[in-house]
Amino acid sequence: MHHTNKKKYGQNFLTDVNLLNKIVTKASITDKNVLEIGPGKGALTKIIVPQAKNVLAYEIDATLKPFLNFENHNNVNIIYDDFLKRDLLKDFDHYFSPNSQLSLIGNLPYYITSPILFKIIDTPQINDATIMIQKEVGMRLLAQPNNKNYNALSVIIQFLFSIEKIQEVKRHMFFPTPKVDSIVIKLTKNNNILPTFLKQFIKFVKNSFKQKRKTLLNNLSCQFLLSKETIIPFFLQHHIPLQIRAEQVTLETFQKLTVKWFIFLNMS
């Protein structure tokens, strides 16, 4: 079968069988309900289907249907549509039993990695995600303070998930060969987060990193429309250096500051 790869969908197919098996092993999907994003020609799907309880895959390119023929298996369904545009709750109600927890697996198109990550965050049924992403993005997710890759996404993802680096993947392991290297990571959700606090945390972190060259003090002043003179007592009270930048602040400190900041705002 012949298929013309479509650049607009970021199609780069992984060809290394050993790595495909490693990804599935690390995902720990035996007898679990699985979502796959972008099955492509089915290289990963063929390994997942015999092991999983049920598989629901989203493939945007309907011309790949001939490669995704699983008529001999009654535990797999493929939706030919854009994952980002789907009402996942409706899909889950249709294909899975109520209150099912799901494991996500996939080689994510580089150009839509962040939107997919935020859709995973917003979908409580997804418990963990074993994903291949652009190495540069992966290094941001794994980055620690005082590292050039450390940003708002690093902090938010590390707050919401425990992150395991599985393997870096060289570009020559794909066909066609992409211009960048990749990395496989596993994200496991922290399910003990109150929705109200999460909303405040994301808002505080995003505003803290709003302009990277500015200090934390300047960013908070600009984004929350407060004078620096109003905010300085808050910094002094909580022993925060006035010249500190967001990329120097640890995840633990961001968590503590979020609580204190919104109390401070309510009192201001």
Curated annotation (Swiss-Prot):
PROSITE patterns (UniProt xref): RRNA_A_DIMETH, SAM_RNA_A_N6_MT
Keywords: Cytoplasm, Methyltransferase, RNA-binding, rRNA processing, S-adenosyl-L-methionine, Transferase
Gene Ontology molecular-function annotations: 16S rRNA (adenine(1518)-N(6)/adenine(1519)-N(6))-dimethyltransferase activity; RNA binding
Major location (coarse): cytoplasm
A cellular-component GO term for this protein: cytosol
Pfam families to which the protein is assigned, alphabetical: RrnaAD (PF00398)
Domain of life of the organism encoding this protein: Bacteria
Subcellular location: Cytoplasm
Signal peptide positions on this chain: none
Annotated SMART domains: rADc
Disulfide topology: none
Coiled coil feature spans: none
InterPro entries: KsgA/Erm (IPR001737), rRNA_Ade_diMease-like_C (IPR023165), rRNA_Ade_Mease_Trfase_CS (IPR020596), rRNA_Ade_methylase_Trfase_N (IPR020598), rRNA_adenine_dimethylase (IPR011530), SAM-dependent_MTases_sf (IPR029063)
UniProt EC number: 2.1.1.182
Catalytically driven reaction(s): adenosine(1518)/adenosine(1519) in 16S rRNA + 4 S-adenosyl-L-methionine = N(6)-dimethyladenosine(1518)/N(6)-dimethyladenosine(1519) in 16S rRNA + 4 S-adenosyl-L-homocysteine + 4 H(+)
Residues bound to S-adenosyl-L-methionine: N12, L14, G38, E59, D82, N107
Entries under PANTHER family matching the protein: DIMETHYLADENOSINE TRANSFERASE, DIMETHYLADENOSINE TRANSFERASE-RELATED
Protein family (similarity comment): Belongs to the class I-like SAM-binding methyltransferase superfamily. rRNA adenine N(6)-methyltransferase family. RsmA subfamily.
UniProt function note: Specifically dimethylates two adjacent adenosines (A1518 and A1519) in the loop of a conserved hairpin near the 3'-end of 16S rRNA in the 30S particle. May play a critical role in biogenesis of 30S subunits.
The protein, known as: Ribosomal RNA small subunit methyltransferase A
The organism of origin for this protein: Aster yellows witches'-broom phytoplasma (strain AYWB)
